[in-house]
Amino acid sequence: MSAVWIAVIAISLLGLIFGLILGYASRRFAVQDDPVVEKIDELLPQSQCGQCGYPGCRPYAEAVGAQGEKINRCAPGGEAVMLKIAALLNVDPQPVDGDEQEAEPVRMLAVIDEPNCIGCTKCIQACPVDAIVGATRAMHTVMNDLCTGCNLCVAPCPTQCISLVPVATTPETWKWDLHAIPVRNIPVEQHV
């Protein structure tokens, strides 16, 4: 019985000592993040698509906040995100990259030519929003509501059976962009 108590006490002391060491190390070696970069990162859509030229939303936020990168390079976020970043940084809004060609951007959707799909799962691994479903050596398909049209699934496909097609805006496919609607709080006078 005494050997059990010695083991319990020894493990408890080791846990306490290691906990104190980890607590000290977390405070001593803490990395302070730039609060502006954090706020910019919160505004970005977090699709990690790479259309801005950076490998994800966090590196783009760091480039905008610390290095003065253009605020108009986020294609999935569009004008709404660009306006929020401009307001946060107190800079003038800029036209979103690619807006010179089109007045209204067309939503793109990945489509898989299912008879040619070999089920290699490379597109599933490349999709940042998990919009592609399927099993190994089985046909894959794209969930239309989740696809952002980021084009990251096209290049890894060995059979070239994935293509991006434009989706026409119809009453069935149109959705509200709630972030583009300005919201104001109007004070209400209370009568006693």
Curated annotation (Swiss-Prot):
Co-factor remark: Binds 3 [4Fe-4S] clusters.
4Fe-4S domain mapped to chain residues: 32-91
Cofactor(s) it depends on: [4Fe-4S] cluster
Keywords from the named record: 4Fe-4S, Cell inner membrane, Cell membrane, Electron transport, Iron, Iron-sulfur, Membrane, Metal-binding, Repeat, Translocase, Transport
EC annotation from Swiss-Prot or TrEMBL: 7.-.-.-
Molecular-function GO terms, alphabetical: 4 iron, 4 sulfur cluster binding; electron transfer activity; metal ion binding
Record Gene3D superfamilies: 3.30.70.20, Electron transport complex subunit B, putative Fe-S cluster
Top EC class of this enzyme: translocase
One GO cellular component term: plasma membrane
Protein residues bound to [4Fe-4S] cluster 3: 127, 147, 150, 153
Binding site for [4Fe-4S] cluster 1: 49, 52, 57, 74
Annotated region described as Hydrophobic, given as residue ranges: 1-26
GO BP of this protein: electron transport chain
Entry binding sites for [4Fe-4S] cluster 2: 117, 120, 123, 157
Compartments, record wording: Cell inner membrane
Residue ranges of every copy of the 4Fe-4S ferredoxin-type domain listed in the record: 108-137, 138-167
Record NCBIfam families: PRK05113.1 (NF003475), rnfB (TIGR01944)
The family this protein is said to belong to: Belongs to the 4Fe4S bacterial-type ferredoxin family. RnfB subfamily.
Biological role: Part of a membrane-bound complex that couples electron transfer with translocation of ions across the membrane.
Alphabetized PANTHER family for the sequence: ION-TRANSLOCATING OXIDOREDUCTASE COMPLEX SUBUNIT B
Subunit comment: The complex is composed of six subunits: RnfA, RnfB, RnfC, RnfD, RnfE and RnfG.
Protein name, entry field: Ion-translocating oxidoreductase complex subunit B
Organism: Klebsiella pneumoniae (strain 342)
Gene name per UniProt: rnfB
